[in-house]
Regions:
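Zinc-dependent deaminase catalytic domain
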Residues: 1-162
Length: 162
């Protein structure tokens, strides 16, 4: 392959690469309402992955249905949630802890912006930056982000201008 051909083979940025992996991880989700994946990274190495679903060993929503409850967001919006589901970010943090991987000052890539509960946990774990693909209720986490040292960055789709 000549130099010109090599230049024409565009490699994804590291951010796009890890975000693509979050989408693959999300395919393992057993949630009927959303497929979310998370990848915790430090120095371009994956420390842990997680997807949303039931706790290990318990029945999945895909098998027995969801256990839905209502909650009210700080903005007054009523939201439907599932008792059974653990979010992707929490599963990734749990996997890191079980495997002895320290995640302080690491970054997390998530298919969607974290919910307010996951954001609070991410702040406490010392995650440095949250990279996400799709916004999800971004307004509910904006105030909390403003007071934390955690950065949040939307990764543009592959092929989008930088």
């Amino acid at each position: 392959m000549d130099a010109k051909s090599e230049r024409s083979l565009k490699r994804p940025s590291w951010d796009q690469y890890f975000l693509t992996i979050t989408r693959q991880v999300a395919e393992r989700s057993t949630c009927l309402r959303a497929k979310v994946g998370a990848v915790i990274v430090r120095d371009r190495s994956i420390l842990a992955t997680g997807y949303n679903g039931s706790p290990a060993g318990l029945p999945h929503c895909t098998e027995v249905g969801c256990l839905i409850y209502e909650s009210k967001n700080p903005d007054g919006e009523i939201e439907l949630n599932c008792f059974r589901t653990i979010h992707a970010e929490i599963n990734a943090i749990t996997q890191a802890a079980r495997n002895g991987a320290a995640i302080r000052d690491a970054d997390i890539y998530v298919t969607h912006t974290p919910c307010i509960h996951c954001l609070k946990v991410l702040i406490n774990t010392g995650i440095r930056t949250i990279y996400y693909g799709q916004p999800y209720k971004l307004a509910t986490v904006t105030d909390l982000l403003r007071y934390s040292r955690v950065r949040i960055v939307q990764v543009p789709p592959e092929g989008a201008p930088p």
